[in-house]
């Protein structure tokens, strides 16, 4: 159980980190944190996982260039705007890559779970950041569940969000983001997130309790 709790905390932190990256522009102070011991150690720990190693290396290269980029905060803000906010942007909304009903499905999911994100997010609820943030919250709910049945329920909610939403549209977003990002910070981040989502789906398939025998 302790291993499950530790893994849950780490998974939630990863989802929330990615949610922050793709929801708002980074300040110069936030960019500076990428040169800190904590972030370097965090990325180094991810690189110990074989599937993540090439993606982490690409992101580390982008970070190294970003740290010495002239007017780095303004330059990265420009990248963010051109990539995600401009008229011909790579939309970070599921409905732009799937169908318009994706937004209504996310609204229904949040309503069923009794979760209100309006105080935290101004974006429509099918935004990548909202979906990633929700995954983090579902992970913590499973970790804090008072019974095995509740834990299984929250693990099932994670699988449903991952397979029914994120994995269904994120690969399209990832490809478009990488193709449209000449500097490469957000493209590298999208690549790492794509690897993580696939790995997390595999993890959930292993950690969910097996069906009871007849």
UniProtKB/Swiss-Prot annotation:
Q: Name one Pfam family in it.
A: Nitrate_red_del
Give a GO biological-process term: protein folding
> Keywords for this entry?
Chaperone, Cytoplasm
Q: Provide the leader sequence positions.
A: none
Can you list the GO cellular component terms from the UniProt entry?
Answer: cytoplasm
Main localization (coarse): cytoplasm
Cellular localisation: Cytoplasm
Record InterPro entries: Chaperone_TorD, DMSO/NO3_reduct_chaperone, HscB_C_sf, TorD-like_sf, TorD/DmsD_chaperones
Provide the function of this protein: Involved in the biogenesis of TorA. Acts on TorA before the insertion of the molybdenum cofactor and, as a result, probably favors a conformation of the apoenzyme that is competent for acquiring the cofactor.
* UniProt family annotation: Belongs to the TorD/DmsD family. TorD subfamily.
What name does this protein carry? Answer: Chaperone protein TorD
Q: Organism classification, top ranks? A: Bacteria, Pseudomonadati, Pseudomonadota, Gammaproteobacteria, Aeromonadales
């Amino acid at each position: 159980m302790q291993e499950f709790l530790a893994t849950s905390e780490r998974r939630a932190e990863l989802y929330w980190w990615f949610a922050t990256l793709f929801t708002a522009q980074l300040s110069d102070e936030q960019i500076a944190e990428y040169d800190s011991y904590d972030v370097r150690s965090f990325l180094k720990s991810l690189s110990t996982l074989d599937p993540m190693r090439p993606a982490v290396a690409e992101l580390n290269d982008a970070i190294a260039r970003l740290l010495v980029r002239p007017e780095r905060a303004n330059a990265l803000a420009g990248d963010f705007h051109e990539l995600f906010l401009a008229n011909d942007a790579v939309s970070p909304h599921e409905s732009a890559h799937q169908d318009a009903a994706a937004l209504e499905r996310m609204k229904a999911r949040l309503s069923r779970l009794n979760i209100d994100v309006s105080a935290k997010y101004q974006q429509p609820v099918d935004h990548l950041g909202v979906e990633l943030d929700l995954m983090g919250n579902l992970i913590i709910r499973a970790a804090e569940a008072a019974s095995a049945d509740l834990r299984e329920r929250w693990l099932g909610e994670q699988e449903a969000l991952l397979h029914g939403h994120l994995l269904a549209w994120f690969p399209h977003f990832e490809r478009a983001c990488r193709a449209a990002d000449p500097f490469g910070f957000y493209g590298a981040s999208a690549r790492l997130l794509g690897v993580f989502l696939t790995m997390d789906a595999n993890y959930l398939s292993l950690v969910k309790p097996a069906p009871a025998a007849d």
